[in-house]
Amino acid sequence: MTDITPLSGDELNKLVDDFEASEHNRMAMNAVTAAGIDKVARNYDRARLMQRRFSTVVDNGTVTHQDRSGRCWLFSSLNVARFVAKQNMGLKEFEFSQNYAMYYDKLERVNYFLKDVAKLVRAGEPADSRLMQHLLSDVMGDGGQWTMAMNVYKKYGAVPKDLFPETESSKNTGERNVQLRRMLHTAVAHMYADPSAIDAIIADAVAAGHRILTIHLGEPPKSFDWEWTDKDGEFHRDGEITPVEFWKKYVGSADLESYVCLVDDPRQEHVKGKKIGIEHLGNVAGGDPTEYLNVPNQFMKDCVRQILQEQGIPVWFGADCHPMMDRENGAWATDLFEYGRVYGVDFDLDKEQRVRFGDSAMNHAMAFVGVDVDEDGHTTRRWRVENSWGDKIADKGYFTMSDDWFTEYVYEVAVPKALLPAEYLKALEEPATMLPAWDPMGALAK
């Protein structure tokens, strides 16, 4: 027997009567059923103010397209890297191979997951525990973090896109991920069945993961000949070069691997100026751990603005991209849609409540490539964003973000360590407070 009371007939009748008694409800129903909620709720007065003009713009060329995949974190990190590479090679347009980066991220994740789970199995972790079930359900998603991307580039480098192009399975990752997930689930089941054979099970599963990835994505190059003609028409030839050498030569000057990830975790128990991390989150075993320095949102804004204005390079960030997004026109603002007016409902959660009660978390990574500052030189009005959803939407793929939306829905940025004050540099040397694997601060890596 359950003690949850059912919805009674009288209650249902009252709901229907109350709805039909309101002319607003009838008009809203007619409009939304015909046009959809976003078109009906769109705030015209706010939308017309979302101008695409900025006082500082970093030109990064044609917008890339991640297609039907969750590789935003790789695309956005490589978009930062390609800006540096284009400057160093004198190119107007250039793309790194996102397929190459994903190949080695997935291969490393297979190894990381198996050895992480093996430790738990050997320690007696029950197969039906919350932790084990979370790890099993979360395995082989496409998401990731800045630090995880840098771990891949440090170990494997990068290659130009035309030397390891997209495949059907890199653009549409669902089927391949299902097969990898099934293979890993089978391996874990075998570990529980025979713990004495765990090492052999891991070796077989890593080999299987390599086969699956190579069948779907192709075999990545170990070295290649690189030739190009720069924007001034001058021909260049590097000769044979490895992916690691290529990365170091054309991106190494920016020292992206040493960047620090700043987050705005709004929950009061997580103190600003302290490091936090997520248990069991990573890809390259032996690589840098996925840790963040928790700071005020305004400090993140100040860092991004300083980088754009003084260094002139894109800035990687993670956000909850869904709320108040006009995808077609490429705009985010906290009042861009008036859903509450249409429904007669108050959506009054603040940022901390949205995180705590599962309403918001990081789910998309992009790059800031512009900012608009008022005449006073202090007030930021809007931000220009390089997305990775192709150039057929928004301003040829570039989005406009209001400053108040940054406050509410941007959670993370990657910045040079040199921008941090002494107290934050000291905090980086202290151990991180580790949060459980299912904490929302790790959601971008799903």
Locations of regions flagged by a protein language model:
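N-terminal regions that are enriched for targeting/export leaders
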Residues: T2-G61
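Active-site nucleophile-adjacent alpha helix/oxyanion-hole segment immediately C-terminal to the catalytic cysteine
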Residues: A47-V315, G377, W383, I393-K396, ...
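Conserved catalytic-core surface of thiol
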Residues: D374, H378-K446
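Long, positively charged binding patches that form subdomain-scale interaction surfaces
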Residues: G287-N363
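Generic recognition of flexible, low-complexity loop/linker segments
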Residues: T290-L293, K301-I307, Q353-G358, A367-E375, ...
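Catalytic nucleophile-His microenvironment captured as a short glycine-rich beta-strand/loop
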Residues: C72, Y153, R356-G390
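Short His-Asn-centered micro-motif
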Residues: F75, F317-D320, V369
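Helix N-terminus capping/helix-initiation residues
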Residues: S8, G36, S97, T242-P243, ...
